[in-house]
């Protein structure tokens, strides 16, 4: 990735041009630039799959830009029919981070897993952008939330988010801690954006009639579920690809956004934005997200000033 001046994108039929106020960095951005995502825009392209932007008539909206003109830019185009009003209680960076991660969390926990008040929810990567959204949504639903993280700094973040129990997978036995905390029952719902070893551990500590919601493979390994194990333990494995709802049931996406806006207005959810970076730092932000070293959300803000160059740099 490199920063270049290019012409402003021209809206196609049914599209509008938006001025980008903030663009959230998502794991799909890392996959896009590696050529590993299910969508492969023609080169050259600009990544950035969700933004908070401003319409030409001054409305503040949330949108998914039309690739190849992604959100790490000053202007994008997006389908007019899919624009959502940005909540007034959130700033631009927070609004940009409310969409995909929180919609995924809401559909995963409520539509797919049918999370109930009083149930125990286990969230992997609880200090990350996707995981922190699931933690907040789980608490808002009245669940007891167990957050799994990697490292002390991320453990502190998960505690601040309100997790009832935080497990540092680098220093603790995840399965044993879950069994101990739940008096041997296990977690009713597991929210897994990681895959690999996280999924393997989930299958060992999911409750009778529990539900494992698979939302991604940020760990880099796609697990192979043992269906005989699911059979003898009576648990469900649920897949979630939020983009299908946007394509097949846009009314459900709008209803979810209305609910998320209400939760934000009541202070029950608020995207955890850890950094706001200028366009010049977008490539570094994507790399750090891919490396798994971040907490919360990194958001690209085109109007943010670039960091001063070190002595001799850029000359």
Features from the language model and the residues they span:
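Glycine/proline-rich active-site loop of Rossmann-fold NAD(P)-dependent oxidoreductases
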Residues: 289-296
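Short amphipathic alpha-helix with an adjacent loop that forms part of the alpha/beta core around
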Residues: 173-184
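Glycine-rich beta-strand-centered segment in the early N-terminal region that forms part
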Residues: 7-24, 32-70
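Short glycine-centered segments of the SAM/dcSAM-binding site in methyltransferase folds
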Residues: 60, 120, 144, 210-211, ...
């Amino acid at each position: 990735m490199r920063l270049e001046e290019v012409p402003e994108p021209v809206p196609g039929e049914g599209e509008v041009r938006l001025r980008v106020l903030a663009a959230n960095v998502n794991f799909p951005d890392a996959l896009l630039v590696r050529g590993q995502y299910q969508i492969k825009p023609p080169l050259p392209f600009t990544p950035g799959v969700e933004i908070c932007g401003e319409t030409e008539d001054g409305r503040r909206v949330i949108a998914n830009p039309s690739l190849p003109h992604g959100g790490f830019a000053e202007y994008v185009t997006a389908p007019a029919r899919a624009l959502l009003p940005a909540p007034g209680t959130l700033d631009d960076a927070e609004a940009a981070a409310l969409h995909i991660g929180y919609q995924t969390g809401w559909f995963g926990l409520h539509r797919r897993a049918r999370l109930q008040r009083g149930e125990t929810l286990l969230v992997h990567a609880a200090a990350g952008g996707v995981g922190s959204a699931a933690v907040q949504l789980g608490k808002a639903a009245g669940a007891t939330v167990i957050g799994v993280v990697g490292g002390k700094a991320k453990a502190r973040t998960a505690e601040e988010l309100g997790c009832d129990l935080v497990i540092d997978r680098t220093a603790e036995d995840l399965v044993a801690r879950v069994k101990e905390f739940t008096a041997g029952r296990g977690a009713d719902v597991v929210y897994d954006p990681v895959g690999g070893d996280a999924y393997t551990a989930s299958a060992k500590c999911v409750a009778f009639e529990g539900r494992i919601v698979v939302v991604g493979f940020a760990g880099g390994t796609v697990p192979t579920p043992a269906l005989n194990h699911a059979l003898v333990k009576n648990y469900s494995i649920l897949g979630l690809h939020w983009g299908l709802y946007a394509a097949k049931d846009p009314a459900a996406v709008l209803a979810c956004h209305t609910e998320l806006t209400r939760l934000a207005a009541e202070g029950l959810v608020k995207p955890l934005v850890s950094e706001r970076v200028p366009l010049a730092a977008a490539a570094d932000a994507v790399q750090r997200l891919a490396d798994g070293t971040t907490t919360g959300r990194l958001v690209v803000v085109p109007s943010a000033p670039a960091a001063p160059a070190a002595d001799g740099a850029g000359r």
